[in-house]
UniProtKB/Swiss-Prot annotation:
GO terms for biological process: 'de novo' pyrimidine nucleobase biosynthetic process; 'de novo' UMP biosynthetic process. Pfam families: Amidohydro_1. The active site is at residue 248. This is Dihydroorotase.
Length: 347
């Protein structure tokens, strides 16, 4: 087994950077390894139009480390009040690359999300016309639906309707977690892709629940049983261009995770590519990591692939117990444990 792995610099097609005092920390972690990232818009208040996207973009650019060329790719947050004109202006901006569907109540800061998919059909039609991709948090939120089944219900009740009605609309089914989602994406047209997180490749619900609740593995969509984890690993290492890297790195302060009602989200951006390398190595598929991390995402979005490279070295290192997060700290995934790959510091 080689002790070094060189690949085109990857991009992250789904990340949460948060805002304010946290930005210098989250942006630095992302910029260390990624050239570009799709920036989630679920701030308070959310990023609803091109003007708000530009303001957030400028805050991110100001937080970049000295000399960094990290490029934030901005996203609009769809609401029941989003208009076709909002979409046209976003597309014309050149810096908004997608719009995000959060079903109301599905995840962090989603209260302003879409209450019924039919409410935005006019907006989706405009998105298809102008070529602005739709990003989807794929879960229903009805209280009678078991949390482990919400992704499948979303496919059957909503996503299948969207892809049938708008066959030219580019759709990214984000952070998929089930075999059902893998099969849906595989069967769909070339306009439908999916991101897969490192934590859903490395863990299943037993890791979160057996022997005690591990709050730093709690995320939404929640970890599923191991048969779904295996389906995700098969998809990520298959070489299919429909599946690409999206960390869904979602930091929360330590006190907000380690609480009676803890927040959902795993912080992985500090070592994202190392975590993916570990998952791919477990499948003896390190040769498939570069296409998944560096080729298929930009290809789907119609953007050029990066030209510079990064190098991973196979060496063990200890993950810190916590990392700075504004005036708070965040507990990263695998805190206090060891990782087996490390990005060269001069990459």
């Amino acid at each position: 087994m080689s002790a070094r792995l060189t690949l085109l610099r990857p991009d992250d097609w789904h990340i949460h950077l948060r805002d304010g005092a946290a930005l210098p920390h989250t942006v630095a972690d992302a910029a260390r390894q990624f050239a570009r990232a799709i920036i989630m818009p679920n701030l308070v208040p959310p990023v609803r139009n091109a003007d708000e996207a530009e303001a957030y973009r400028q805050r991110i650019l100001a937080a970049r480390p000295a000399g960094s060329r990290f490029e934030p790719l901005m996203v609009l947050y769809l609401t029941d009040s989003t208009t076709p004109d909002d979409i046209r202006r976003a597309k014309a901006s050149g810096f908004v690359h997608a719009a995000k569907l959060y079903p109301a109540g599905a995840t962090t800061n989603s209260a302003s999300g879409v209450t019924a998919i039919d409410n935005i059909f006019g907006v989706l039609e405009t998105m298809a016309e102008v070529g602005l991709p739709l990003l989807v948090h794929g879960e229903v939120t009805r209280s009678e639906i078991d949390i482990f089944d919400r992704e499948k219900y979303f496919i059957d009740e909503q996503l299948s309707r969207v892809t049938a009605r708008f066959p030219t609309l580019k759709v990214v089914f984000e952070h998929i977690t089930t075999r059902d989602a893998v099969q849906f994406v595989q069967a769909a047209g070339a306009n439908v892709g999916a991101t897969i997180t490192a934590h859903h490749l490395l863990y299943n619900r037993n890791h979160m629940l057996v022997g005690g609740i591990r709050p730093h593995l709690f995320c939404l969509p929640v970890l599923k049983r191991n048969l779904h984890q295996e389906a995700l690993l098969d998809a990520a290492t298959s070489g299919s261009p429909k599946f690409f890297l999206g960390t869904d790195s979602a930091p929360h302060a330590q006190h907000a995770k380690e609480a009676a009602c803890g927040c959902a989200g795993c912080y992985t951006a500090f070592a994202a590519i190392e975590l993916y390398a570990e998952a791919f190595e477990q499948r003896q598929a390190l040769d498939k990591l570069e296409p998944f991390a560096s080729h298929f995402g930009p290809d789907f979005y119609g953007l050029p692939r990066n030209t510079d490279e990064i190098t991973l070295v196979r060496t063990e290192w200890d993950v810190p117990a916590s990392l700075p997060f504004g005036e708070q700290v965040v507990v990263p995934l695998r805190a206090g444990e060891r990782l087996h790959w490390r990005l060269e510091s001069n990459a």
